[in-house]
Structures are given as C-alpha cells and as structure tokens.
Amino acid sequence: MLRELGRTATVKAHGRSVLRPVRGPAGRRQVAFTGVRPSVRVFAEAPAAEQAAKAIKLEDVKEGSEYEGTVTTVEEFGAFVNFGANTNGLVHISKLASGFTKNAKDVVQPGQKVTVKVLSVDAEKKRVSLELKSAVAAEASAEESDDIITEPDREGADATDDDEDVEVELEDGQVEVRADLPGFEDIPFVMEEADMDAEMSEAAIAALEADLDGAEIRYELEAPAYMEEVTGKVARIEDYGVFLEFEWNGKTLTGLLAKDEMKVPSSALSAEAQAALRAEWADTGFEMPAFVELPDDELDVKKYYQPGESVPAFVLESSLVDGRGISLTHFTDEEVSAEAVAAYEELEDDEDEELDKMMADAAGLEDEVLAFDPEALMEEDEGEEAGAAADAGDDAEYEGVSADGLEGANGNYALGATRSGLIKGKNGYQVAPMGLPSRPLNDAVTSSGLAILGTSEVDFDGDEVQLVDYWTSEAFDNIPKDVLKKLGLKMSYTEAGEAEFEERADFEATDVPFYLYGGDVESRAKEFVADLLSDDVDEAELPARAGRAPIVLAAAVQNISAAEVKALREKTGAGMMDCKKALAECAGDAEAAAEWLRKKGLSGADKKAGRIAAEGAVARYIHPGSRLGVLLEVNCETDFVAASEKFQALVNELGMIIAATDCICVSPEDVPEEVLAKEREVEMGKEDLANKPEAIRAKIVEGRLQKMRDQVALTNQATLSNPDKTVAELVKETIAAVGENVKIRRFIKYRLGEGLEKKANDFAAEVAQQTQAKAAAPAAPKKEEPKKEEPKKATVAVSAGTVKELRDKTGAGMMDCKKALAENENDMEKATEWLRMKGLAGADKKAGRIAAEGVVASYIHPGSRLGVLLEVNCETDFVAASEKFNELVNYIAMGIVAGQNVQYVSADEIPAEVFEREKQLEMARDDLKGKPDAIRAKIAEGRAKKIATEMCLLDQPFLTDPSKTVAEAIKESIAAIGEKISVRRFVKFQLGEGLEKKSNDFAAEVAAATGAK
C-alpha cells in the first residue's frame, strides 16, 4: 500500500506497456513536479475487443486441440497468444514456422489473428506451449518508422510558450499516455517499449497474459494527500493550535492545525471588524471569506475556536514526511508563495545586490527551473573521462517506497527523491508548486511509477504548465549555460553524443550561493531555513508559513554567508535579519556580532528567558553501580516541546553533567548564604591575607568567593558533548532551536553512604579488652536454686522431604527448618509461624548494626511530571546487588509517589514546630470550639499524630500488600536477607510545583490598551 500519500491511486496498463521512461512533447512550458497523481491511463496502439470472451479453464485445454486467438506481444524468443484461456500461451520462435526463423516479428505482429495448436499444458504452473498453424494478415494498426525522434533545440523549447495540443504519432514499440486529471486529458506523452530484460510490473504482466484493455490495481492509501481539503471537529484546544478529528476513507484521523497555520472564522469577529471586512470585499465583487488571517498578537485560539465546532482545513504534512502525524493549514501554496516573494521584495535594494544580479542573469532563461545539482558533475576524481562523469548522476542513490509497502504488485515502484525549485514563468519568479528530482533516475519506470510522474500542473495563477521529465532527459540537458559559467565550466558534446566539460581559461572563483548551485537544494535550503523564523512579533521576521518556500527565504540572507547566519542564529536565538545585520556591523566576527545583539537586546533567547515556563520534565540519572544519583526538573513552556527530542537530549545531558561535577546549585546567584558565610570566614582566616589591610583583604575574599560561586554553579559547567561550551550556552541554543523559554529549575544529588560512619574492625583493641576482662577477679558464684525438671518431649521424627518443603517455603536454613518441625510436631503452618517469629526477633537485633552500603535509586512516573530519588542502605554490597533488595527499593520508591503527603522517612524526623503547627490548626477548628480545653487538646493531639503518620513513609501501607506497613515489609526483608535495611532519605519533585502558569486575559489586555490610548 502506498503509505500516507493520501488518495486512491488507479493504474491501468495494456499488454504493450512494458514501460520505459516517459518523454514529453515539445511546445510546453516546463516546471518541476513531485507528488502522486490520482490515476494514469496507459493506452495500447490497437485497443482490444470491447468485451472479452468467457475464459477457458486450463483444465479443459487438451493437447492437440486447435484454437483461434490474438497475438498480444512479440518477444525475441517467441510470441504470446490469447486463445481464450485465463493464461496466455507461448508460441516459441521455433514453432512459428516450419523453417528457421531469425526474428519473431517477421512472422507475427501484436493484434494479429492466428490459429494455434496446443502442444503441452501445465495447469499447476499456468503454462501453455503452442504451435502456430496459420495467421491472418496483420492490420496496420500503427505506422512503422525507423526515424529517430530528436529532441527540439533547448533554447527554442524554452522560448516557446504555445499551449496548443500536440498530435503524437506512435512508432513501433511505443504507447501513448494521458493524465487522468480533469481538464488535462488531452495532454499526450509517448512511452517506449522496455528492453527485453527489463523488469515488468504485475500490472503489465497481467495485461500481457490476459489481453485486457486495462489491468486495474487500486492502492488504498492511509492518509489524505498534500493540500487535500478535509473538514473536522475541534477535539482539543491548546495555546499553540487546535486538534481536528476528521473522517477519511472510513477512518477517524486527527490533525494539528497550528497557530502559525491558522485563520479565524470571520463570523467570530466583532461587528465593526465584520463591517470593515465586508466593505473591503464589496469592491472585489466576491463574497466575504469565511476565514480571515489575524496578526499573531490578536490571535487567541481559545477565543475563536470551541470544542465540537466543524472546521475545514488543508492537509499540509502527513507522517510520511517527518513521523509527527498530520499537520493542517488554512493557507494555500498560492498564499504562501505570495508572502515569501513579497517578503523578499520588501528587502532593501542595497542588501541583496548579488541575489538581484543572479535573478537578472536568470531572467534570460525563459521558463527555466533554477534549482539543480551541477556539483555532481565535478565529484569524479581527476583524470577520469568526461563520459564517466555524465553517468555519475544516474548512478546516484535515490529515496523511494519499497515494494514491501505496496499491496497487490511486485514491480519496480521507485519514487524519485525531489526538491523545491524557483521557476520563472509568465507571472515572474515563483516557487515551483511541486519540485524536481535530486538526480536523474536511470531505472525503468513501471506502470505504478507513472502514478508519481504525472503530466501537468497548474501554477499559482492558474496557468497550465508542462512538467519536466527528469527520468529520461539527459543528465545535463537542463543545466543553464550561465550556471556552468559561474562554476567555471564549459560543456560540449562529442560525436557520440556524450557531454564533455572543460574549465574556462578566464574563470575567477567567486562565492557561489549554496542554496542555488551547491548540493541538494531542498535539504540544504530547508536545513538553513528551519530555525530562521521567530515567533517574536517585534522582530519583524518573515512569516512562519514562508518556511514552505525555503528557496525564497534562503535568498533573503545571501550577502552574508548562510553558514555564518545560521551559526549565529543557533547561538543567540536572534532573528534572521537581526543576525544578518549584526554580522554586517561586525565585519563577519561571530563573537562581536553576538555581543552586539546582546547589547541591542535582540537576542531571541534572552527575550524568551522572561517567559513563564511551567511545563517540562522531571528526570533522573543513576550512575552505573547505583552509588550516585541525580533528580532534576527542567521547565519549558508547552508539553509539546517537553516531549521533543531536542529537549529530552538537553535534560539527559544535564543529568550526567550534575553527576560528573561538584555543582551544588543551578546558577551562581543560588549559592546558599550559609555556605558563603562559612567560606568567607575560612578565607578571611588564611595566613596569606593576615598582613593585608582590611579593605584589600575583603576585596580579595569576595573575588575568591565569586570564583567559588562559578565553580559550584551548574550553568558554568562545561558540557559533555562540547567541553568548549558551557551549560548556559547549551540551554540558550536549545531555546533558539525549540522557540520556547527553557529553564533549569532545581536538582539534587545523592551519593551513597555520604556522611555515614562505616564500622571499623580494630582487632588489637578487641584482644586487649578481652585480656583485661580475664585478668579481673572473678565474682563470687551465686547460689543457684535447683531447677525443676520438666518432662522431656517425645522425639518427633522429621523426614527430609518435609524439611525440604519448609525450606522452599520460608527460605530458612536446613537445621532451623528441622528444629521448627520438631518443635511443632511436623505441623507446616505452625513451623512457618515459629520461624517467622524467630526471624523477626533476629531482625530487631540486626536493627542496631551499621548499614552504610545499599543503593541510590529513582522512580519517574509515566509522563515525567513526578519523580523520586531515594537512598536505601544495607550492610554489604553483596546484598545491595541482590534481586530481593532491589525489588524492595523499587516498591518503596513507587509507594512514595503514591502517598501524596509523604514528606519524612519516620515520625522522628518531623520537626517539633511542624507537629505543633498542625496541633494548633486542629485546636482552632469549629467542631472543637464547644468542648472543654483538656478534651479539645487531646483530640487535637490525636488528629495531629494522624496527620504526622500520613507524612511518614514507614507508616504508609506497603504497595504490594496494603495490609502491612512499609516498616513491617522492611522488617520481613531483614529477616529474609539477614542484614539491616534502612531507608535513609528521599526527595520528591513534582513538575511545576509552586510555579505560576500564564493565563491570557485578552479582555483585560484590550481594556488596558484602550485605556492607555
């Protein structure tokens, strides 16, 4: 299935259409093209019968039988004959005549009536071998000619602007092709028969074998095509656009109508605005449009669109383009091109002298496409012949849709890679509505391939134009002479018709603009233009929609090197024209230009830094080994940017930078005052400053403190991807790239066992202590009373199988299991309880040990809006790496997220003032005012304790078993593992917690603006 191109494409082919490249007739204005045609028809030289006879089953065909049939095609090895069966039979060249036959075409012709005899039938493989018995004289269905069709002179073709229909005479081995588009059915194309070893499509094979007038294959496409009109209901409204749900081909699809691509209903405007608009359109003779464009500062998406409303739109992009779903627009290509060209025309004359000169040079090339790839001509190594250079373009790789993506056919369905172009037509320079191939395509084009060629297009002013066929034109036919001159090359043709290139003697190298002459125009121009547009109204930037016309936009910045403008834009986030002006003012010095922009207040990143950023992500980085962990929150303005690859890459790198450095705060201004006071005291007491005057000493200390601030601030750390760049610069570049304010809000770092005292074994001290204990005089023995003898329990026989069963159930030791069974007379349940009680008693003993090993772990809730970092300790790294321990840690982390009010590990950590504040709040409640003070105090204290319990992690229900608390679950793990386990600390970040989100009150803004006037 042709994926996500949007329409249902129909391909019809005849038996003679073993397809080769298409050549358009002369006398048509040529423009570039890319896209998918709804349908293409391929006609035969002689049409078949209007109604095919009922097919004979192969099982009914008997050897020796004779049939009348029609020759469908003639090959070197013989002829295919349709004799009424559902499979065409083959008459081998040796069976065409009684004598020797050199050429099958000398005996039979396509369409000729013949009588054949069946030699053999293979129903399983659907093969029938025939012998020619007799043949009716062939009718002259097509004129035979050995003349060579020559292409008209190129310059003459360019100067021709005649749109009259062209009569096309078919030669032997040719077919006629017409576009199945309303109004363009009369435009003919000539197709030549492929070589004998050319690969045939399934459609052509079906037609060859069945002699059908048209073998029709339909491809059901998954998404609407470019600029197809759809109407959907508003499903969701955001500040950056609306999501429309619409029905297409029986499916419900969702597309984003972005704010930059949006118009508003004229009916939603104020009465005054509607009256002015109606008066404006009254002079044109047309009705007032249903949708109108508003300036960005007046466009409030939520004001003009409501959920459930029906909204029409055009399809701008589908997932085939960039994998981001369906994008919608209210602007046609005509409007976009007009905006881009108008923006170029508004540039000052002295700013684009070089571009104007190029345009003037191109003006002499009537109807010529100005986007191509002549650098491919010079990619060969020196010393190679020019003829080899001519083949370089043909052998280049091209992108396409593989046969796996098609349904019902296995032919060659190559889609040529295409790019945008700037054309010169009747109405001046315009962006080509479609595009042209990056390189000529040498492969044979099949019937399916025709669906992407098409034959004609309509330019922005409704003029019909003929399409360039880059699949069959010679590699160098479409290179203007002035371009070769600019490149220092001269082209000529050898006697064999091969192109030769030689350098001009008087050539002087000049800076050739990259967008027009170098490399793949579309990819380079789009890459250059991608970040040039700014949504800041006060920067007077080119319109955002003009990004669909990258050639025109790229043209607007050619005086200054495009690479320099792009680099400065990425670094500062300033507008395109501002960057160009800054480089011009600073003689191309990028550093000076960046400083110039900053002083002028034109840095886009600096402007965006003032916006409220309450969206973003809570992320974590756990260093391998789980001994170091980081939890951080990075904010942006919208969840759309938060989910972008660029933003996520920034967050991930920040986490690793925090782990790798000694930073303790985000910026130098965030260093805690107590840390500065302590450092100031230390510096003032150093001996190297003792003999200096107080004022000088204070100044030196402040300088050292500032250096310390810079060292511990995250924004001043070097990035991992580029050590020459700081984190602050990386954030600024991200702001410029995503177009939103990005801010590092907070982070925290845990290092395992930090501040804990590990147990140290001093064996010498232990031996000395034991020696002193032995040397001490023994105390007088107490007189013990005789113990009462208890009757001995009868010995219980315990089987090995029972011991194994209990051991598997509890995990206890073998001797412990045996003793438990003996004590409980082989009762499995009682023995299990006995072991549990014994184990918990052991756990209480282990609680006094020092636990300085363990893990630093984290849990990020899906959506990256809530995250937890915690440290859980045990006694040995062996246990810390065990599966049971890590499973416990993960459940505890998820439990912290689940408990909304969890703030402390245990009740002992709750500050006294917090408990007292909660108690006073409860005392002041209305339901306790009528009670005596003593009773009220007791009730308030009970409620405060309950609140305190809700704040403590250890008192929360355990995630997997709410019948027990986290403390009880830890105690059971201690009994099972055999080491002390303790939750040392944790921290929880919730995205945007405490931040104020921006709310747009347009009524208040309008009132304020009116009052200001």
From Swiss-Prot:
The keyword Plastid applies. One of its GO terms (molecular function) is translation elongation factor binding. Residues 64-133, 227-331 form the S1 motif domain. Residues 1-43 form a transit peptide. One of its GO terms (biological process) is response to light stimulus. PANTHER family: ELONGATION FACTOR TS, POLYPROTEIN OF EF-TS, CHLOROPLASTIC. This is Polyprotein of EF-Ts, chloroplastic. The gene is PETs.
